[in-house]
Amino acid sequence: MSIKLAVKKAIYNYDSAEKLEDAKIIGGNPNGIISYNQCPQAWAYPLYKNMEDRTWFPRQINISKDKVNYSKLPEEIKQGYDLVLSQLITNDSIQTNQLMDSINQYVTSPVVNACLSHQALEEARHAESYAVMAEDICQDTNRIYELYKHDEELFLKNKAVADMYNILYQGATPTEKDILLAFVANQVLEELVFPGGFVFFYSIEQYMPGSSAMIKEINGDETLSHVPLFQNIFNTAIKETFNGIIPEEVVEKAHRMIGHMCEAEIKWTTYVTKGILGFSEHTIKVFIESQANSVCKNLKLPLLYPVVELKDNPLRKLMLDHLKGGEVESKTMFFEENATEYAKGNLDMNVDLGSVNWDD
């Protein structure tokens, strides 16, 4: 079987004969013009509007109590705070760059390009949020940004994330299967790598309420926009380019990627909590493996780990309690309502937009 190389789109392709309504996720030949009303990926514009509606700004979050309480934190919790903050800064810095420098070059549907551009903006905003926390709360800002140079576990965790994304750089030109794996990597970062750090901040909310509130907004962006975005990008690309069948090679490599990052995340989350927050290694393992299974489920891959009951898992409960209600719930309703509105037009909304099952 011949290897099909991925097509890098032109900025403006005036020779294109491709109709706007024929745009594909990968392998297309677009002219580069964004037409929201003629996009064949019916989920793309509603997701874009959802991202717009979720706009928020880091300086709106009150962190005054955190400034006072940071110096009073037990040393173990303060160390965990610094480590997790440093790691999240790296995640979103990498994500901001790779979305525009790598992924978006090979996505050939203009409206989906717009969604990815909006996500990159949100990732940059998340990095700004962490900067606010590092500069206004922590005692040594430069130390936070350079902590990976001094902590081996943090260095290894950051390297694992970077290595996962290097799939696009293994050859001079990536193949279409490489692009699929890059989509998987994005889903892994959003759904598997971030949650451990998020629940750490939720667990110290009574001491650091502003930090927890900031993370809640970031978590809402990831859960309500970024996870369904790459879920739909991957599944649509499989349908459009691979006749609805995920290539076995992609399944095998995706499983290795997910499994490797799951192990790295369990090790990292165990390291930064050190049992100080009442999280046992078993509790962490079950939670992270369930997140890995969620990645598989959303991408229609076979599950990697046994399905377990999560109702009483404290990490899962922490995350869902903070995503339920308030702004995040209202944004979910907005998204559902707008999806219905778009369905009244010519868009086929009978697609899986991605959602959070609050009762799992």
Feature map (PLM): residue ranges:
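Non-heme di-metal
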Residues: S2-D360
